[in-house]
Design a protein with these regions (language model features):
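Extended, low-complexity cationic-aromatic segments
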Residues: 2-99, 209-210
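RNase H-like polynucleotidyl transferase catalytic core
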Residues: 53, 114-118, 132-153, 166
Length: 220
């Protein structure tokens, strides 16, 4: 199993090794909370307000598909990639937003290891050719392994902040995008480092599970 082989081949990587990795992924951010059930919390003495009540919305209220990356220095640039991004569009994201992230954090690209999953857009010929021409190294990634990617914690953090930091849902997609940009800054460098520091534990969990999927991503 590729997941098990990958975890074994990286089980001796130290946190210093993982510090070099830029983890990347896309995620869908809904205008009205989650994809399925919606939950709200209030203190016993609190009165029910607009934050606690989910409005009924025709057609689900809409969502934005975004790309970003997670580095040891903090959250990378976040970009709205649309719902039909192809390999050409993804390549533009790498050329623009990935490189801007490296530049903004002062990262030495020759020491960077770039991670992406095996989505066909990511593994297309034009993307592979461009990556092969870059000074940074590409990290081979096992299939179906979101539990190994610490950026999933970053996305969960961002979505929690979007839900809890405002009294009411955004009134438009433009406002949702504005909130995403603002919420990015609520995720600290220290939190990003905590997520990346979990990589040895993630590898160990996959080995213990003999390559099967783990629940570690819920337990940091």
């Amino acid at each position: 199993m590729k997941r098990l082989q990958w975890a074994k081949s990286h089980q001796h990587w130290t946190v210093d090794d993982w510090k070099r990795v830029i983890f990347s992924d896309e995620t869908k951010v809904n205008r009205f909370a989650s994809d399925g059930k919606a939950y709200a919390w209030k203190l016993p003495h609190e009165e029910l307000n607009s934050r606690h009540v989910q409005q009924t919305v025709k057609h689900g209220g809409g969502n934005i598909m975004v790309w970003s990356c997670l580095t040891w220095e903090g959250v990378g640039w976040i970009v709205d990639v649309g719902h039909r991004m192809n390999s050409e569009g993804y390549l533009e994201v790498l050329k623009d937003d990935l490189l801007k992230t490296m530049e903004s954090y002062g990262l030495d690209s020759s020491k960077v290891v770039f991670q992406q999953d095996n989505d066909p857009k990511h593994t297309s010929k034009i993307v592979k050719e461009w990556i092969n021409q870059q000074p940074f190294e590409a990290l081979e990634w096992p299939p179906q392994s979101p539990d190994l990617n610490p950026i999933e914690h970053m996305w969960a953090h961002l979505k929690r902040e979007l839900f809890h930091s405002y009294e009411a849902p955004p009134t438009s997609m433009h406002e949702l995008w504005e909130r995403i940009g603002q919420t990015r800054y609520a995720i600290s460098k220290e939190e990003c480092q905590k997520y990346i520091e979990s990589m040895p534990k993630r590898c160990a969990a996959v080995i213990k599970a003999k390559g099967r999927w783990t629940k570690l991503f819920c337990q940091i």
